[in-house]
């Protein structure tokens, strides 16, 4: 979904509605203007599974490459809301129903009140697993991921979304005193200087 069709309130309500129907929800942002909602009735351990087994990427690499997913790092870079983050974002939001379908009746897009890429990044930042040092990304996958690659991938989109400089800096901070942390922090400073 293009972020221009949503404001923060609609994003929260859409997330709450999906969580009302499905047990699990993750939100990916493959590019600054797009949100992809992945919902399921069973646990979604996509990143963990891919890091451990290479699946499903290993079975059909060309299929996923069309969407820019060539490594587990590509998927982690796109992940902006894991299950705990999306639950926090959606907490207290009103549901979208047939009788109150704000997705169908909203004039957010028509009035130019939709989110920009930068606004989207800033709204999602507190819930983003890459910006939370206590998230599963660092606890469970940290040793298996090339965070320098993730940061470079994000930097490629920084001209379209200024919030990515802050995201990169927070990744560097989460990595602490390490070679990857030093590299990512330096890249974050460089990206911030270009915007």
Task: Provide a role label for each language-model segment.
Residues 1-4:
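ADP-ribose/adenylate-binding Rossmann-like module
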Residues 7-29:
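Conserved Class I S-adenosyl-L-methionine
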Residues 26-188:
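Soluble small-group transferase modules, centered on the S-adenosyl donor enzyme superfamily
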Residues 189-195:
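Alpha-helical linker/edge segments of TPR/alpha-solenoid repeat scaffolds
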